[in-house]
């Protein structure tokens, strides 16, 4: 492996603002960078990212790589992948982390293929082996009945991290990271899809994907009427409300 000098996390933004999972993977990356004695960088892909860059710095990133283009304002898989590939090839990180989100599930496997490196997905823990300085990534296997710890031996040592595994670090308003813009030249023809409209879903209470406690029901409740007591309980607990499949 080359002696690459950074841990790189690929953050996610919505309308130019960090989404909560980015704080979680910055925390995971900060731990790894400290164990390795190297710097932590956060890559942000989108448009109008000044606010997101400032927020990422206050959460623990030393360096911010910014890839802005109006074509990246809304997620389009092929364009996002092109930008992520350019970033990783330019930076050549030692460790690369993404969140196990819909974007991470879409992009990470194809990014790994482009970089010609293995990928460990859906990790519950990432840490550095003190003796080899290699990434150890722990993930569930056999339907969650066992855990496997995978040693990564090729740079970038690439893993996706499950949401809600790491807590974001406390915000430090005084932190200011180094901001480095990276030019990304995108051709609209690269995209195989087109965003024609965006509809914001309004929901009451805690969003399910952000909830630390979930109150769930199943078919036995019979229908919407049966879920109303669960909603009251969820409100009392500050929980999200879900359903079994």
State what each model feature region is.
Residues 1-245:
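N-terminal glycine-rich FAD/FM-binding segment characteristic of electron-transfer flavoproteins
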């Amino acid at each position: 492996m080359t002696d690459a000098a950074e841990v790189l996390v690929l953050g996610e933004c919505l309308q130019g603002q960090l989404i909560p999972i980015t704080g979680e993977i910055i925390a995971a990356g900060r731990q790894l960078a400290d164990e390795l004695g190297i710097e932590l960088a956060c890559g942000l892909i989108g448009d109008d990212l000044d606010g997101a860059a400032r927020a990422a710095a206050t959460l623990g990133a030393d360096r911010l790589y910014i890839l802005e283009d109006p074509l990246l304002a809304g997620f389009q898989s092929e364009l996002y992948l092109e930008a992520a590939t350019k970033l990783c090839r330019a930076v050549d990180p030692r460790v690369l982390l993404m969140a196990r989100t819909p974007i991470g599930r879409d992009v990470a496997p194809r990014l790994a293929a482009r970089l010609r490196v293995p990928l460990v997905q859906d990790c519950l823990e990432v840490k550095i082996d003190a003796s080899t300085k290699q990434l150890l990534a722990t993930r569930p296997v056999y339907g969650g009945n066992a855990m496997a710890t995978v040693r990564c031996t090729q740079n970038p040592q690439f893993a996706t991290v499950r949401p809600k595994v790491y807590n974001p670090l406390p915000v430090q308003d005084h932190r200011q990271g180094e901001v480095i813009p990276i030019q990304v030249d995108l051709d609209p023809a690269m995209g195989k899809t087109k965003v024609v409209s965006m509809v914001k879903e309004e929901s009451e209470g805690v969003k399910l994907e952000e909830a630390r406690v979930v109150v769930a029901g199943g078919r036995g409740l019979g229908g919407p009427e049966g879920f109303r007591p669960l909603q009251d309980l969820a409100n009392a607990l500050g929980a999200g409300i879900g359903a079994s499949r």
